């Protein structure tokens, strides 16, 4: 009944071949690449590998953590991560690879925790940002289209500096000022005031805040008339309204939720979940080959500061104090530094981003402090400037927005799509309500119902699941956390290992009913957001 299993050791691959018949996915980990080769030369797994029924992992690969994170983030796996367990294929592996197995198991548990945490089963943030995205559409259609920026500026210069607001930033500002004409500067909104005090004008300022606290960063927006202010499409509407100017660009994320509206002029980019991630992906989209990062500490400094001197909310920002802490390797391998789980999640996401784009650009970590970030070259900011920044950067005019006629037509099409989504949401709510009433009728009985009847009910639940899983509106990721919760509820039943089918289906129905109530509540919230458009 488990949808996947993790196994350490390929052995002679016969066990893997036989198990593959019973699982949707088998994840096989091996520390000796020669054993992979030997096993695959004995047993043909080509068909299983081709359709990802069997996935092989090299335990000594540098990017193993990233590979695991990618798999665990897949919706079909994410839902059932609470079932994770590392099985060992034979006593041989336990005898000779126990240390490797324990280390791998710890890594998998950590990756599963990050994936589950990111899924956000409360759906609070996805529902909030979905509503804000809908409110921002009219402003976005009047802003600079992202595709015009790409058409006019892509591959025109090689060197970029991404500025973050970590504690190490202050010591880099004098050098940044000296070289500001020789690099295109991407500035996280939180670092803006520090640059302003030094007379440094960034080329791009990025923002993706779901609250309006960031309005404080833009108090001197008149200094940014030649800068592009890049806002993520779901940033707080108050920020969008306060910055609604000819140099604003509101960008759509490269997610199904935003792509399904076909507003292609304004997308698409992986803005990530923190502002500097947005800066890096914007620099990559514009074709920069050398991306230098400063102020990217992702850790507290020795005085316990979370941000650089001059940060608008103080060097010890209260928002960072109550998050669970941990120690991680420090920049340049100099011991360890204190961070918290949110920064650490950001670091893992950045490492994934850098590893995936190492053929497009070279990433230089010139922070000279904070946490070590893998898949970057650690080099002092001075060395980066002297080595790379030898040419003046080009000057550009601000691109124009769309004509009013074109933006009005796009708005009409957008509203038509929203109308269809409303109808779809209402249909699913009605179906869910009918199903809820059936399940409550079954659960109200004080005796076990016949197995044949229960099997029909179980099949109806599977059919409803299938309709949910195949619908583009339902699967636009706003309710991703709700489906992670569905998986957890079902996994809790599977972990009971109920052998009797009647008792198993009854337990399944009880769990599904509890989830269905939760799902209806979240879908109702999404429906209300659509109704406000």
Ranges and model annotations:
Residues 40-41, 174, 197-200, 207, ...:
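Short acidic, glycine/serine/threonine-rich loops at helix termini
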Residues 2-4, 158-162, 202-204, 257-268, ...:
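Short, basic, glycine/proline-bearing loop/turn elements
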Residues 1-160, 167-183, 193-194, 213-217, ...:
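N-terminal donor/sugar-recognition subdomains of glycan-related enzymes
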């Amino acid at each position: 009944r488990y949808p996947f299993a993790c196994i350490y050791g390929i052995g002679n691959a016969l066990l893997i071949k036989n198990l593959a018949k019973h699982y949707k996915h088998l994840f096989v980990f091996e520390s000796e690449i020669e054993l992979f080769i030997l096993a695959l030369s004995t047993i043909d797994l080509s068909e299983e590998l081709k359709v990802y029924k069997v996935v092989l992992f090299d335990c000594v690969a540098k990017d193993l953590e990233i590979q695991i994170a990618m798999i665990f983030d897949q919706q079909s796996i994410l839902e059932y991560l609470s079932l994770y367990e590392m099985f060992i294929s034979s006593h041989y592996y336990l005898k000779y690879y126990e240390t490797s197995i324990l280390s791998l198991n710890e890594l998998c548990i950590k990756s599963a925790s990050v994936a589950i945490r990111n899924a956000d089963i409360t759906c609070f943030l996805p529902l909030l940002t979905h509503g804000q995205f809908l409110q921002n559409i009219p402003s976005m259609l009047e802003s600079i289209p992202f595709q015009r920026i790409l058409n006019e500026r892509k591959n025109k210069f090689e060197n970029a500096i991404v500025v973050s607001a970590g504690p190490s930033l202050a010591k880099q500002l004098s050098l940044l000022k000296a070289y500001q004409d020789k690099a295109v500067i991407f500035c996280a909104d939180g670092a803006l005031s520090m640059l302003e005090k030094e007379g440094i004008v960034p080329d791009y300022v990025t923002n993706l805040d779901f609250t309006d606290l960031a309005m404080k960063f833009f108090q001197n927006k008149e200094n940014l008339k030649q800068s592009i202010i890049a806002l993520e499409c779901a940033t707080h509407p108050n920020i969008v309204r306060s910055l609604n100017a000819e140099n604003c660009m509101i960008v759509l994320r490269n997610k199904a939720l935003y792509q399904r509206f076909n507003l292609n002029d304004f997308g698409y980019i992986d803005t990530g979940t923190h502002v500097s991630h947005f800066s890096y992906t914007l620099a990559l989209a514009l074709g920069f080959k050398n991306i230098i990062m400063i102020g990217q500490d992702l850790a507290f400094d020795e005085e316990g500061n979370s941000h650089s001197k001059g940060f608008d909310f103080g060097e010890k920002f209260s928002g960072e104090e109550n998050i669970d802490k941990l120690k991680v390797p420090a920049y340049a391998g100099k011991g360890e530094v204190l961070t918290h789980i949110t920064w650490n999640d950001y670091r893992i996401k950045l490492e994934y981003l850098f590893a995936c784009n190492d053929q497009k650009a070279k990433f230089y970590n010139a922070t000279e402090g904070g946490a070590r970030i893998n898949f970057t070259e650690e080099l002092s900011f001075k060395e980066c400037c002297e080595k790379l920044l030898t040419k003046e950067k080009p000057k550009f005019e601000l691109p124009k927005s769309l004509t009013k006629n074109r933006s009005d037509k796009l708005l009409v099409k957008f509203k038509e799509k929203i109308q269809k989504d409303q109808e779809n949401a209402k249909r699913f709510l009605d179906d869910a309500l009918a199903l809820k009433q059936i399940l409550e009728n079954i659960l109200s009985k004080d005796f076990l119902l016949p197995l044949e009847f229960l099997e029909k009910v179980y099949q109806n639940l599977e059919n409803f699941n299938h309709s949910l899983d195949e619908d583009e509106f339902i699967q636009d990721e706003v309710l991703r956390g709700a489906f992670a919760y569905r998986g957890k509820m079902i996994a809790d039943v599977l972990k009971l290992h109920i052998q009797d089918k009647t008792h198993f289906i009854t337990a399944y129905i009880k769990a599904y009913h509890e989830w269905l109530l939760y799902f209806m509540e979240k879908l109702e919230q999404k429906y209300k957001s659509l109704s406000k458009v």
